[in-house]
Amino acid sequence: MALRFPRFSQGLAQDPTTRRIWFGIATAHDFESHDDITEERLYQNIFASHFGQLAIIFLWTSGNLFHVAWQGNFESWVQDPLHVRPIAHAIWDPHFGQPAVEAFTRGGALGPVNIAYSGVYQWWYTIGLRTNEDLYTGALFLLFLSAISLIAGWLHLQPKWKPSVSWFKNAESRLNHHLSGLFGVSSLAWTGHLVHVAIPGSRGEYVRWNNFLDVLPYPQGLGPLFTGQWNLYAQNPDSSSHLFGTSQGAGTAILTLLGGFHPQTQSLWLTDIAHHHLAIAFIFLVAGHMYRTNFGIGHSMKDLLEAHTPPGGRLGRGHKGLYDTINNSIHFQLGLALASLGVITSLVAQHMYSLPAYAFIAQDFTTQAALYTHHQYIAGFIMTGAFAHGAIFFIRDYNPEQNEDNVLARMLDHKEAIKSHLSWVSLFLGFHTLGLYVHNDVMLAFGTPEKQILIEPIFAQWIQSAHGKTSYGFDVLLSSTSGPAFNAGRSIWLPGWLNAVNENSNSLFLTIGPGDFLVHHAIALGLHTTTLILVKGALDARGSKLMPDKKDFGYSFPCDGPGRGGTCDISAWDAFYLAVFWMLNTIGWVTFYWHWKHITLWQGNVSQFNESSTYLMGWLRDYLWLNSSQLINGYNPFGTNSLSVWAWMFLFGHLVWATGFMFLISWRGYWQELIETLAWAHERTPLANLIRWRDKPVALSIVQARLVGLAHFSVGYIFTYAAFLIASTSGKFG
């Protein structure tokens, strides 16, 4: 018999129904469940797949550079970044006839093109790239790295080059290499690039390999470093009249602490950024020498954790047993990594707009909106994944004897308290926030807007004031002009910070009021409810009051029959599934808030947000409805405009989203009927009947239908909002 998919499971391969295909896809990456898997092969497979992942990333970024160099307008954009629209790539076959061809021919292009809203132009410009040749060189280099990654992945699957399990479990060596090698050396290298290429580039000096050794990034070279006069590197920074990319108003400093933004580009000073990366490099190079490996000096992770017993004994045996638990569980490690990466990705979203690092990106409003939304959605998916793998850890890897009375066991012991507190917070936030919104809605409906309940966020305003925002009149810490911190700040550290905080031309510490207070609590409700569902799913993964033997059923199971009184919807997978809806909902509120506030800020009518965001009808009418009008009008009986592709995507996104409900409302048999109908039609059609469908169609399982429904819901939801966001922003600001 020919080998059928999936090869990794003989049991599934012999299944005569469509279950074989579905379950094969579902378990393709669950290496632990494959036939003949050993711990050694498991680690080696994952290790090799990392190289494949890197190869894909390098190929993708190489493609970005290549297509912009080939079909973009980088060189003309560099001449006038504020008025030339950056081109991502050409459109081969614009639909909808000649009007579409004309609508999409822009940015100085000869034919129809897509505009880039990813910020790559600003990024490449900031780091010193200036010509198409530079872009091609970068694309080729990344292509080379991609090939190297593929070879490395293949090599590490060969018997002679396969690392052993002990190598994978050597935590200290891995920490040292990742801290020093990955973060330390790469940050140092990046500082080098900024100092030798990007900063001279911002001052009109074109540095490449041919003149790399001739152009000193600082007039005195390494002199100040060796003579201990490090402060010289910060003297004579670029002036406030500096024109980016030219020598006009340029200084000579390379490592500064100016704070604030470059007046022309509205981005952080490149010399501040270089200084930051040098500091990061130093910290991580030191950190990467802290752990004990060959020489018997430094920390042992296990000793650190074992020694960490809490004072007063109120946390039991503290961290005892944790080292082996974490080191032997890939799911625990993945959960920790995803939790960290998720938080970092969300922080990237918050900082990319408030402290823009790339020249002129702050004035490209559509790009700012797209990048914020993109990073928040990515963060949401990564964070929910952290809890999913936390739950799988509890089911597959947790050993109660090994963790007796330590902090992990105690989390399980008092899970009822954790869940009830989260539940109480969610209910409190939900009812109070909705109550305020609805009260305000009713007051506006009855024509008495003055009876709204409007709460000033005084604590948040106080925190902003403490950091130097003076408009609230709090007179505290950095907003107190007579205080020592304020006076020191004028000269010693970050003199540009206070100017930036109090300027209205950036997104740093935006002025907040009652509308912000309400939406902040709506978002807090979403975050706490999502967390409640995820935490409950993980803490109850091994068993709950209703189903104490849950861990024997695995991570995702549908039900265990009527005998127990209702065990459907209680697998750890179900918690993840429900949490993703809440996650998407919450990020919806986050992005609506960010986008609306910024649209009014950029248009100079902040009062619209302030007045309309205090009641739900305001959000529906003045944000969603008002901003979707251009979108719905993307193509009409009179022809096509450049928003037509977004209008089409807006409709298509709704279609995909709505398709999700077909699977979510337990219409699982539809799959069976659909395939059987198609198979029947093929079997009775000449030529088509040469291809036989061998697998007997069976209805989707509950879990499968939910997964298919969730996938459509998520993709449709994001497609719809992406189209709305880009069209409504670019329609206003170009």
From Swiss-Prot:
**Where does this protein hold phylloquinone?**
W671
Give TM segment ranges: 46-69, 135-158, 175-199, 273-291, 330-353, 369-395, 417-439, 517-535, 575-596, 643-665, 707-727
UniProt entry keywords in alphabetical sequence: 4Fe-4S, Chlorophyll, Chloroplast, Chromophore, Electron transport, Iron, Iron-sulfur, Magnesium, Membrane, Metal-binding, Oxidoreductase, Photosynthesis, Photosystem I, Plastid, Thylakoid, Transmembrane, Transmembrane helix, Transport
Catalytic activity, reaction form? reduced [plastocyanin] + hnu + oxidized [2Fe-2S]-[ferredoxin] = oxidized [plastocyanin] + reduced [2Fe-2S]-[ferredoxin]
The GO annotation for biological process reads: photosynthesis
UniProt binding sites for chlorophyll a B3: M662, Y670
Tell me the residue numbers annotated for binding [4Fe-4S] cluster.
Answer: C559, C568
Q: Where does the chain bind chlorophyll a B1?
A: H654
Which compartment or compartments is the protein found in? Answer: Plastid, Chloroplast thylakoid membrane
Q: Which is one Gene Ontology cellular component term of this protein?
A: photosystem I
Q: Keyword Cell cycle, does the record have it? A: no
Report how it sits in the membrane.
Multi-pass membrane protein
User: What is any Pfam family matched here?
Assistant: PsaA_PsaB
Biological function: PsaA and PsaB bind P700, the primary electron donor of photosystem I (PSI), as well as the electron acceptors A0, A1 and FX. PSI is a plastocyanin-ferredoxin oxidoreductase, converting photonic excitation into a charge separation, which transfers an electron from the donor P700 chlorophyll pair to the spectroscopically characterized acceptors A0, A1, FX, FA and FB in turn. Oxidized P700 is reduced on the lumenal side of the thylakoid membrane by plastocyanin.
What assembly does the database describe for this protein?
A: The PsaA/B heterodimer binds the P700 chlorophyll special pair and subsequent electron acceptors. PSI consists of a core antenna complex that captures photons, and an electron transfer chain that converts photonic excitation into a charge separation. The eukaryotic PSI reaction center is composed of at least 11 subunits.
Q: What is this protein called?
A: Photosystem I P700 chlorophyll a apoprotein A2
